[in-house]
Amino acid sequence: MSSNNNFDNNKNNNNNNNSNQNNNNIDNGGNNNETNPTTWKFKAQTPTDFNITVRKRRNSEPGVLVQRSYKNYVTHWKLETKKPTKYKDAKEERLRQQAQQQQQAQQQAQQQQQQAQQQQQQQQQQQQQQQQQQQAQQQAQQQQNQHQQNQHQQNQHQQHQQNQNQNQNQNQNQNQNQNQNQNQNQNQNQNQNQNQNQSQNQHLHQLNQHHPIQHQHHSNNHSNNHSNNHPNQQQNHQQNHQQNQYSQQNYQQQNQGQNNYNNNSFQGNSNNNYNNGYNNNSNNSNNNNNNNNNNNNNNNNNNNNNNNNNNKNSISPTSSPLLFPSPSSAFTSIKSTPPKSISGSSSPFQDQARSPSSSFFHDRDLPFSRGGAQRKPSIGDEFKFHPYSLNNKVTNLIDNCNNSNNNNNNNCTESNDDDSPLNGGLGYSRLSQRRISLPILANRPPSPERSLSPIHERNSLNIINGFNKNNNNNNNNNNNNNNSNNNNNNNGNNNPLPHINFENRRPSREEPIVIINNNNDNNYNKIPSQHMHDKKSSPTPRSILKQTISKYHGNECEEEEEYNTNSNYYGDNDNRNISNQNLVASNASQSSGSKLPSIQSLLNDVSISDNKSKSNSNSPTIIGMNNNFVGGANENISKLSSITMNHHSNFNNLVDDNSHISNNNYNNHHNNNNNNNNNTNNNNHNNNINNNNNNNNNSNNNSNNNNNNSNNNNNNNNNSSNNNNNNNNNNNNNSNNNNNNNNDNNNRSPRNMLFYLNK
């Protein structure tokens, strides 16, 4: 009790109103819906001993947590029902008002509907009344008409009777007159009677002659009517038939004119579309001089129009002419209809020309596609790949050799050509259809199963072969093959434009870059068919994904390959012919001193020849999923001691700027990039050769078309060892403009990642 007295003294001294309020609440257990505190563990003797703290619950359940304490002793927490809100009545009134308003609105709507129905009924009644009135009027008019007709008939009958009476009276009068005349004639002399008899006989004879003349006249009229009607009808029928024939001829002529106009306009539009899409290939489609240095003025005009009128093609990023097809891979989801040939001409481009109403950007989205009827590629085809199946898309690459309509069979690469891997090329023959590409690491988890999947494995060489997959008459100026420009083979042959389906698509972010070694030695006499799938799981992050590739070379132990996704390396893929250099990262060279392998060691476990001394000169060539990685021609990847490297200008313009360009302004920005390339081409060729659709060979003609320079690659070796990409060709200062602007470290984020393989 002493403690209670102390508490009461404190309350009296401090005038604690809160305790009084709590008092009232507890005394009046029914007030404000509070529960009676008789069920608590600690029962107070006086109700003023309690302090109440109220907390809201976290969830939206009803009630609050109430903490009641006796002095400083916390009894327990208890869930009590939530007190009614002060504005509950107001809310109820609002709800009532809203309900009343809704009811009133419903009633008004019902009343309006009823009124509308009543109005409709009234209108229907009025219409019925009007119809009844009209029917009554019609009946009255009919009655009047009948009455008038009856009166008219009666009048006619009366007139007819009157006429008959008059005729009878006249007949009676005539009879009387005749009787009088007869009496007078009888009173004449007998001599006169004789004369009358003679005159009567003559009169009868004249009557007999007069009636046959009338009959003949009637028959003549009838025959004239028949003879006049039927020939006229026949003539009219013939004239009508001739008019119908004339109208049919006019219709046929109009149809022929329209068909000719449609055909001409169709071909014209398709050619214009082709010129817009394919730039330098259109006007020389029937010649073998597509890749001459001095292009025709028509060709240049088309290219100028393409660069100056890109708004025609810049409808949307997806409908632009293959400059920016999709951020995803073009091998999976692009659907296109096969082209239909317009005419039977020998032009290879009309096989791929399409109507203006259809989409202009058709099969060039797919690097595998060719001209001619072909079924639509589906996503399932990606998983049906087999390297030796006849249904493979690689067989399309060989069709040029077997095509009877192919006028230039120099594209048919055999194993003894300059392109074959036996002779040091990149391998465009049938032996090198087994191919490999490194994995796509962008936007993927670092699982080692994705490293060397066969789905992506077939993409790199298809793109390489796509460069050889040219049309019929559009192949080479000379008799050499497309990619025969090796390190020692700059014999003045111009590298032609790549295939239309192949060059105009920009690479997506997910497409890998494969490092391939160009080896000019005839060391690779055998490509075994063993498939490589040795996998090695590693907990390393995605930036450095280590995997093992089993080497086919003897008893060498397995070594790791390092995928450096943070690198800034960009390479050139112009002639597939970059001179011999080693691109070795500094950490890789310091740690293991390893060397980059050749492409033959990666392609299906290809055995490396015994001449290991030449493996040091194996130059890496960066081959992406698209030929648009092509930079300045014959520009070398320099030896670097760090993981930074200067951009090549064309690679910058064609690839890297896509990550900085919005979709809407893509074409305009891309035209500016192409104009940078065109300055070099204008200086080289004195022509306005413009690249609308990333024609990489136009930017590569800076060094490819230098027919007078036979030491291009040697100069590249000297310059690339000094980290100078300026002097690409000693005799071609104009082509160096592509690289002068790129010695700065423009370290933009690359679209695709280089994968460095440590041999």
From Swiss-Prot:
Region named Disordered: 1-47, 142-380, 409-428, 463-504, 654-759
Composition-biased stretches (Polar residues): 348-360
Lineage top rank: taxon: Eukaryota
Low complexity bias: start-end ranges: 1-36, 142-211, 221-347, 463-495, 660-747
Name of the molecule in the record: Putative uncharacterized protein DDB_G0279653
Gene source species: Dictyostelium discoideum
Lineage: Eukaryota, Amoebozoa, Evosea, Eumycetozoa, Dictyostelia
